[in-house]
């Protein structure tokens, strides 16, 4: 039976962290040839004066970007809140801008920079002229119907099937990249210098190209929608906001040190085709997990969409780019190939695509971002959502989207009642769904309709917001719509963060690892996790590889259970971007109960054909291949080989495939050297670490990512009022900490008296996790939010 689907994330038209691609579907060939004042207590910061030297910073090990060998000789220390750490040299601290400071001391004459910028812009303008001349061939012919582009255009940026493009911003970003190449050539920079971002700063005369600071109110009780002003320091107000670039654990492997993707083996030959690797390493086999359910997989996708979204490059007119011939019989070459094309070649003997004459899978390189440093440098991919765990999937990452989702009554979000139960609001623009879908919804994220399970998790948190807003309005009838909306949002984000760090991560990374890193939260006590020097930026290695672990967890079907009928299996290949089944009676309760009971797939090398053959197939006999897209996207991002991250994580390098046993034999079938193995397949093939879902390399990378999401977030829900101007009272905090995902589900079930929910919502029901009536679950006591004196 076919296997998995999910955690789609980065796309090539949208990065996300689970599905990653920038894909325009091929035509079917016609023949086989074709802050408040209240009492509080705070976890005290330990005295570090005797532990670390003046030029060192005490931090959790994953925050220090040194590799494991260098970390091993660092002096131990105790961080806030009393977590074992290391004394990391401040120049190696990921949260500082040490590279920029060093670069500014090594900058060349301004005239060389100006010359490079001039020539870079001229080169970009020439490419645009070339694009105009060959637009008929370079652009997709099925827009706006082509699902693979349509679904990636963020809400509010669509106009008649085309994306609104800020031409000047795009010219600055790509002119900057071409200028960096020119500068590297003019100054004879080595590849190591380029990959280390040792470029010159931009002269003051033209620094209008640099990102300006965002004006902020450092005492705002509520976090902004777009993630700005989380860090109120003058030069850091844009840190972590939507559109900010990804960061990295290791330097990128751009072959020219600037933007050329990683395509060569260490032997000098070309790396194997991503599709060849997919076929050899990721077959379909039904292997259900014995403990965890589909809801764990689906929450993983929902969480990943909160901090990862990218889209592929488009023409200056906002049109999707085509990198394959119309019938996908070959990649485009020569004058017809757009400079942002990075298609996947399919061999003629492919066991599936050869039936349709497909020799090319379309993929366009991810759009780049203006970097925060006012300097030339290598390309940095744009993340189009906030870099925080702030439920942007519910509220959006821009003020325009947030406003569109609000009812502006009683603090509520918009909803709909097409079958008598509360569902998401109908989308004004149905291009996020297949044309034949009977309904299409709108949420805070453009991928809301991708999978039924994802749509229902969006529905769950929309319902929870509205439940909180209505409850607060009854307790505080004098509050206006804005206050009710912001307070309900503040509580929901806290509930969500509590679920992520205290229910989801202990399963994903292992309880021991979560405790060791200080990722688990205490009850009824404030913390001071916040580190203003740590940049809240999603790691490219997490978005482009590690958080795509979830593709292995996806089952090829959803099994819906009701008392009145036998189980119904709905195959994911038939319902991508089609949430029509939500219109059936009692759909919310039926689906949420079923997700609790159905096992997810095991974390292993087996992927459902629903993802590797039929991804977004619409009504065609074939779709795309998510495994191939993941591998190619990692190369687009210039993520370094798997071996480099093994070494960074302290596992040691592999020098012979035989060191990995059976897995090594599989890898040797497609790779020439252990140093060629791509990060995503290497990480997926690792056996799970003790107590974790994923292997040790992904545990290390995900730990680094989730440490940032907590320690670089001033508004993290357990931070006290000396840090967080929107801190909860201790009584409120304790109430939130006792909230569970099971309780949230029960609070929003339509028929609570008939709904049974196990306490551990991410695990299958069992003798140790028996479902009990929802009437036994307590909800958040909103009486603690009553404003006295009114």
From Swiss-Prot:
Binds 1 heme b (iron(II)-protoporphyrin IX) group per heterodimer. InterPro entries: Haem_peroxidase_animal, Haem_peroxidase_sf, Haem_peroxidase_sf_animal. The keyword Glycoprotein applies. Glycans are attached at residues 259, 327, 479, 680, 785. Extremely resistant to denaturating agents, such as SDS and organic solvents. Induction: Expression levels increase 24 hours following blood feeding. Peak peroxidase activity is reached at 36-48 hours after a blood meal. The modification N-acetylcysteine is found at residue 210. Pfam families: An_peroxidase. GO terms for cellular component: extracellular region. It catalyses: 2 a phenolic donor + H2O2 = 2 a phenolic radical donor + 2 H2O. It is found in: Secreted. Disulfide bonds join 216-229, 433-440, 746-774. It comes from the Eukaryota. Coiled coil: none annotated. Heme b binds at residue 551. GO terms for biological process: egg chorion assembly; hydrogen peroxide catabolic process; hydrogen peroxide metabolic process; response to oxidative stress. Its cofactor is heme b. Its EC number is 1.11.1.7. The keyword Zinc-finger does not apply. Involved in the formation of a rigid and insoluble egg chorion by catalyzing chorion protein cross-linking through dityrosine formation and phenol oxidase-catalyzed chorion melanization. This is Chorion peroxidase. The gene is pxt.
């Amino acid at each position: 039976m076919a296997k998995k689907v999910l955690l789609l994330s980065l796309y090539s038209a949208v990065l996300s962290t689970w599905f990653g691609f920038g894909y325009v579907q091929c035509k079917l060939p016609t023949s086989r040839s074709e802050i408040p004042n209240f009492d509080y207590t705070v976890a005290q910061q330990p005295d570090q004066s005797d532990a670390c030297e003046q030029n060192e910073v005490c931090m959790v090990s994953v925050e220090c970007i040194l590799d494991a060998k260098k970390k091993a000789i660092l002096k131990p220390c105790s961080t806030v809140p009393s977590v074992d750490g290391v004394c990391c040299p401040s120049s190696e601290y990921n949260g500082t801008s040490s590279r920029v400071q060093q670069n500014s001391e090594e900058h060349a004459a301004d005239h060389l920079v100006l010359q490079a910028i001039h020539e870079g812009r001229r080169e970009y303008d020439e490419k645009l002229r070339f694009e105009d001349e060959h637009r008929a061939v370079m652009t997709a012919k099925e827009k706006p119907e082509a699902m693979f582009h349509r679904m990636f255009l963020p809400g509010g940026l669509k106009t008649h099937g085309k994306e609104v493009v800020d031409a000047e911003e795009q010219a600055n970003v790509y002119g900057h990249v071409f200028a960096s190449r020119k500068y590297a050539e003019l100054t004879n920079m080595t590849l190591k210098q380029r990959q280390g971002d040792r470029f010159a700063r931009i002269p003051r005369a033209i620094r209008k190209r640099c990102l300006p600071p965002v004006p902020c109110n450092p005492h705002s009780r509520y976090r902004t929608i777009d993630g700005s002003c989380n860090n109120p320091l003058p030069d850091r107000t844009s840190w972590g906001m939507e559109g900010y670039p990804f960061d990295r654990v290791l330097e990128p492997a751009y072959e020219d040190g600037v933007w050329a993707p990683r395509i060569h083996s260490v032997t000098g030959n070309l790396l194997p085709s991503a599709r060849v690797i997919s076929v050899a390493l990721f077959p379909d086999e039904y292997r259900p997990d014995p403990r965890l359910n589909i809801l764990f997989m689906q929450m993983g996708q929902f969480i990943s969409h909160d901090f990862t979204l990218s889209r592929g490059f488009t023409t200056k007119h906002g049109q999707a780019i085509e990198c394959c011939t119309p019938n996908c019989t070959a990649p485009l070459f020569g004058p017809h190939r757009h400079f942002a094309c990075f298609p996947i070649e399919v061999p003629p003997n492919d066991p599936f695509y050869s039936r349709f004459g497909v020799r090319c899978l379309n993929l366009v390189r991810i759009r780049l971002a203006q970097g925060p440093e006012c300097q030339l440098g290598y390309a940095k991919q744009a993340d189009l959502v906030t870099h925080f765990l702030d439920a942007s999937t519910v509220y959006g990452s821009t003020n325009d989207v947030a406003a569109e989702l609000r009812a502006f009554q009683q603090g509520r979000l918009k909803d709909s009642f097409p079958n008598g139960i509360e569902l998401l609001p109908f989308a004004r623009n149905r291009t996020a769904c297949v044309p034949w879908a009977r309904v299409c919804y709108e949420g805070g994220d453009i991928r809301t309709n991708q999978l039924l399970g994802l749509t229902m998790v969006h529905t769950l948190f929309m319902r929870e917001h509205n439940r909180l807003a209505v409850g607060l309005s009854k307790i505080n009838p004098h509050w206006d719509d804005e206050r009710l909306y912001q307070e309900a949002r503040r509580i929901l984000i806290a509930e969500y963060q509590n679920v992520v760090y205290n229910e989801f991560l202990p399963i994903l990374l292992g309880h021991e690892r979560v405790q060791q890193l200080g990722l688990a939260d205490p009850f009824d006590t404030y913390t001071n996790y916040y580190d203003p020097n740590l940049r809240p930026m999603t790691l490219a290695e997490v978005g482009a590889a590690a958080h795509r672990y979830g593709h292995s967890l996806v089952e090829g079907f959803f099994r819906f259970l009701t008392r009145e009928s036998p189980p119904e299996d709905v195959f994911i290949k038939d319902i991508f971007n089609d949430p029509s089944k939500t219109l059936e009676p009692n759909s919310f309760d039926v689906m949420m109960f079923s997700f609790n009971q159905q096992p997810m797939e095991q974390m292993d090398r087996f992927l459902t054909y629903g993802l590797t053959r039929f991804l977004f197939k619409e009504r065609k006999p074939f779709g795309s291949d998510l495994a191939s897209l993941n591998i190619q996207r990692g190369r687009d991002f210039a993520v370094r080989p798997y071996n480099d991250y093994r070494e960074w994580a302290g596992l040691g390098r592999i020098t012979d495939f035989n060191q990995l046993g059976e897995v090594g034999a599989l890898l040797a079938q497609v790779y020439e050297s252990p140093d060629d193995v791509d990060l995503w397949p290497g990480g997926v093939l690792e056996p799970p670490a003790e107590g974790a879902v994923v292997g040790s390399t992904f545990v290390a990378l995900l730990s680094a990512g989730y440490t940032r999401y907590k320690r670089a977030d001033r508004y993290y829900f357990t931070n006290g009022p000396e840090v967080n101007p929107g801190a909860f009272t201790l009584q409120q905090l304790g109430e939130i900490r006792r909230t569970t995902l099971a309780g949230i589900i029960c609070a929003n079930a339509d028929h609570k008296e008939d709904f049974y929910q196990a306490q551990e919502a991410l695990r299958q029901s069992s003798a140790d996790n028996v479902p009990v009536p929802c009437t036994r679950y307590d909800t958040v006591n909103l009486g603690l939010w009553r404003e006295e004196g009114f």
